[in-house]
Amino acid sequence: MATLSVDLEVQAQATRAAARQLAQWSGADRQRLLSAIATTLEQEAPRILAANQADCEAATTEGIAPALYARLKLDADKLAAAIAGVRDLAQLPDPLGQIQIDRELDEGLILQRLTCPVGVLGVIFEARPDAVIQIASLAIKSGNGAILKGGREAICSCQAIVAAIAQALAEQQAPVEAIRLLTSREETLALLKLDRYVDLIIPRGSNSFVRFVQDNTHIPVLGHADGICHLYVDQAAAIEKTVTITVDAKTQYPAACNAIETLLIHEAIAPQFLPVVAAALHEKGVSLRGDAAAQTIVPMEAATEEDWRTEYSDLVLAVRLVPSLDAAIAHINEYGSGHTDAIATEDAAAAAQFFSQVDSAGVYHNCSTRFADGFRYGFGAEVGISTQKLPPRGPVGLEGLVTYKYVLSGDGQIAATYSGAQAKPFLHRDR
């Protein structure tokens, strides 16, 4: 283990050096590099898809859970979408060197706050091979290095993708060490201890996996442990519209962290709404678990207290009837994970109250929670979703992968001039 730690430390040092080199590239050069990566990924698509097929076959033999298999599976459409995300990202403005503050403290004493890279990202994820493409492209665009560790079930897919990225980096005379792939659990544990060389850990995976990462590192962690999302159907909801939203939010990709896990229905509209939505969900193979009030309207399995706290990541949906908007908000703030929650209503005041009082990273009105995604927000891609209160919060794109530094330029000014009885006043004039 000691030898492994030393070897990984050397690799992390190389990644940090590569990241510093990459950060010196112009925005146009990094844009060109991303375009080259997208082209190489397209050229290598048959090899990548074949590698993923091998991973899927091995996972099936081992009895992988359906939700994890859904994340693992990389078909041609999903790969094409990931590559399109790289091209979209390439066209976004350069996030580095942006002037956030430009202030004249005094004549000839200029303070600026400039954006700069975080440094080295340690990204650990389960199954999701397309995450490699998203994370590597975001890291390059933002001038960061990335050390990636995918789940063992996706090892062939990840190796094929990273090989294609490395090929593009080499062909463009970019530092290949900027993007590095780890393959063993032992390396994961060692990575979590490299606080001297890794600046941010980003875990993507199950609740237990993310909590394991949070509990085993001193490096700052960005991410979320749960994706318990809600849709509240208000008494003023439009039934047909809301049924469509509900079906999409649960079934469009049930393994996603932004799929709803609990459906809250105002008791005044439940007799009209619940039978219709239950039939639509049944057609999609969704199993319902409801409280006693819901069961009197539509036969379904009885829900327990644990169901309100469960991220199913599957075609299972908990259903609860509530007497008021206040009760729905209280339920969400008690049982939700702070990810994304939505209200369906034609009452603007109810929507405004929901927006104000639900304490989540994303609060929606009359639309599916599945929009909680960096690509759909126009970020080009996302490195993950954060439910923490401090920024970045929600889908994390480029802005979450840069920090800032204060740059002060003067001409011999000293602090003593501005202190004491004869202190010269500051101008503090924004330019």
Swiss-Prot record:
Keyword RNA-binding recorded: no
Pfam families per UniProt: Aldedh
UniProt-recorded Gene Ontology molecular function terms: glutamate-5-semialdehyde dehydrogenase activity; NADP binding
EC top class named in words: oxidoreductase
EC number per UniProt: 1.2.1.41
Transmembrane intervals: none
Free-text function comment from the UniProt entry: Catalyzes the NADPH-dependent reduction of L-glutamate 5-phosphate into L-glutamate 5-semialdehyde and phosphate. The product spontaneously undergoes cyclization to form 1-pyrroline-5-carboxylate.
Protein name (record): Gamma-glutamyl phosphate reductase
Gene source species: Synechococcus elongatus (strain ATCC 33912 / PCC 7942 / FACHB-805)
Name of the gene encoding the protein in the UniProt record: proA
